[in-house]
Curated annotation (Swiss-Prot):
The record marks H179 as: Transition state stabilizer. Belongs to the phosphoglycerate mutase family. BPG-dependent PGAM subfamily. Pathway: Carbohydrate degradation; glycolysis; pyruvate from D-glyceraldehyde 3-phosphate: step 3/5. The keyword Coiled coil does not apply. GO terms for biological process: gluconeogenesis; glycolytic process. It comes from the Bacteria. The gene is gpmA. This is 2,3-bisphosphoglycerate-dependent phosphoglycerate mutase. It holds the Pfam family His_Phos_1. Substrate binds at residues 8-15, 21-22, 60, 87-90, 98, 114-115, 180-181. Keywords: Gluconeogenesis, Glycolysis, Isomerase.
Length: 228
């Protein structure tokens, strides 16, 4: 029976500052580092082990994975990084404080941008502070100017089918360290959560989510490791 573990990165600097982060690269806070270490220690204590690891191109997810693996004595495990596991791109909201954005645009509009399934935020204007077009890690990639959750799912699921699902079907134990919305995409797919419900699903930082899967990758169980 294949085992899959999902971990949202530990608290980041912009989580702490309540800013829209998206594709912008920010580091973990001390609390985020502690969350990642605790996740690794918990997985080791519960007897979890892995054969293959996946993460995004973003530092906060990569570091969370590395810190957790170090706590498990598994830094040597193979890791594949891919931009398709990145956080949802928040477009022109990137870098803005969420409370200030609500004061400027109104709570209702900000809720639409944050929590609707298929309505993206305003686009990120090219050439600005948060333009990633010259970031070498994204060379050859068509960087989005904004994304809805639906857009995020549209890039995450092909990667799942192409790379991750075959590993699980081959019997490999897999851990994915990623982001709130890229993980929502996977949870929606695996647990068949409707469009209007997935936007309300909260995924806390640094908490391993365990999926016990049938051989055809249908979900038999989903739970937070800390609760079992």
């Amino acid at each position: 029976m294949p085992t899959l573990v999902l971990i949202r990165h530990g608290q980041s600097a912009w989580n702490l500052e309540n800013r829209f982060t998206g594709w912008w690269d920010v580091n973990l806070t001390d609390q985020g580092i502690a969350e990642a270490k605790a996740a690794g220690e918990l997985m080791a204590a519960k007897g979890l082990d892995f054969d293959q690891c996946y993460t995004s191109f973003q530092t906060r997810a990569i570091k969370t994975l590395n810190i957790a693996l170090e706590a498990m004595g598994r830094l040597w495990l193979p890791v594949e990084k891919d931009w398709r596991l990145n956080e949802r791109h928040y477009g022109g909201l990137t870098g803005l404080n969420k409370a200030e954005t609500a004061a400027r645009h109104g709570d209702a509009q900000v809720k639409v941008w944050r929590r609707s399934f298929d309505i993206p935020p305003p686009v990120l204007e090219p050439g600005g502070e948060f333009d990633l077009s010259k970031d070498r890690r994204y060379a050859g990639i068509a960087i989005p100017s904004t994304e809805s959750l639906k857009d995020t799912i549209a890039r995450v699921l092909p990667y799942w089918e192409e790379r991750i699902a075959p590993d699980l079907k081959a019997g490999k134990r897999v851990v994915i360290s990623a982001h709130g919305n890229s993980l929502r995409a996977l949870v929606k797919h695996l647990s068949h959560i409707p469009d209007d419900e997935i936007t309300e699903l909260e995924i806390p930082t640094g908490q391993p989510i365990v999926y016990e899967l049938a051989d055809d990758l249908t979900a038999r169980d989903r739970y937070y490791l800390s609760e079992r």
